[in-house]
Amino acid sequence: MFCEFAIIGTTASGKSALALQIAQEFSGVILSLDSLALYKQIDIASAKPSRKELASVKHFGVDEIYPNENFSVGMFFKIYERAKDYALNADCPLIITGGSGFYLRSMLSGLAPDVPKCDKALSNDEIYALAARIDPEFCAKFSPNDSYRLEKWYQIYKFSGAVPSTWLRENTSEPVIKELAIFEILWSAQAIRERIQRRTQAMFEAGLLEEAKFLFDTYGRELKPLRSIGLKECADFFDAKISREELASLICTHTAQLAKRQRTFNRSQFSKIFIGEPDAAREKIKGFLKNQAKRP
């Protein structure tokens, strides 16, 4: 029975493990939303599923390209279409999971055209004041402290000369997914910190430093995926800028900061069917799939 749904959550929340369990039990396939797992050879730093796990369940969005190859959201849409076609032909569930909420939001809301960056001649307060005058729709959705959104709004305004909210409606492509059940795994901040610490230690034991050295020796250090959390700190360690203890601490700190940003993004961008810890989410998803199986 084909259906599609998403399991989201912060980094180290256990969403990939839950997706794997559900896929094994219901003969499903997985589409990864992880922006680092896309890359071949970045296995430990991306917390990619093991080779055994990848062999047990068909995955899309994992090991798609090499670190020195370009990637875009449009390319991700094509991977989604491949995954959906496969699941339709196999008549099985498609489980979408990972931490890159931007990919998921783009599939649900459509993809806006790229807008060139411009010099930000105004402060955030000045941009927000301008938006309040000409684009109250934007101000109703976003905080005056949201620097990223304010900069994007200003870029669109300078590029188009139009009201950004109106311009986006007129120029954004149609969503590739019209409706999607979304389940979010949520832990307390303390629980996530502890999970991050355990995962970071496991990454070192699995050979994170050796993987980082191989990647830097092969590709240099300037490629975007090689400046991700877990790798950028290794570069500082190799340069003797930080100690081994500081290396682990910084990776944990930066990962926890990422988790906080992901939680904020998920809360503001998606309507969920369920929010809770993995065991409760598992039961909700099983109920959802059983209901899907009953549909004519």
Swiss-Prot record:
GO molecular function, one term: tRNA dimethylallyltransferase activity
Top class in the EC scheme: transferase
UniProt: ATP binding residues: 9-16
GO biological process, alphabetically ordered: tRNA modification
Binding site for substrate: 11-16
Gene3D superfamilies: 1.10.20.140, P-loop containing nucleotide triphosphate hydrolases
UniProt keyword annotations, A-Z: ATP-binding, Magnesium, Nucleotide-binding, Transferase, tRNA processing
Marked site (Interaction with substrate tRNA) residue numbers: 100
Cofactor: Mg(2+)
Region (Interaction with substrate tRNA): 34-37
EC number: 2.5.1.75
Catalyzed reactions: adenosine(37) in tRNA + dimethylallyl diphosphate = N(6)-dimethylallyladenosine(37) in tRNA + diphosphate
HAMAP family named among the record's database cross-references: IPP_trans (MF_00185)
Described purpose of this protein according to its UniProt entry: Catalyzes the transfer of a dimethylallyl group onto the adenine at position 37 in tRNAs that read codons beginning with uridine, leading to the formation of N6-(dimethylallyl)adenosine (i(6)A).
Subunit architecture: Monomer.
Family: Belongs to the IPP transferase family.
Protein name: tRNA dimethylallyltransferase
Species, as recorded: Campylobacter curvus (strain 525.92)
Gene (UniProt): miaA
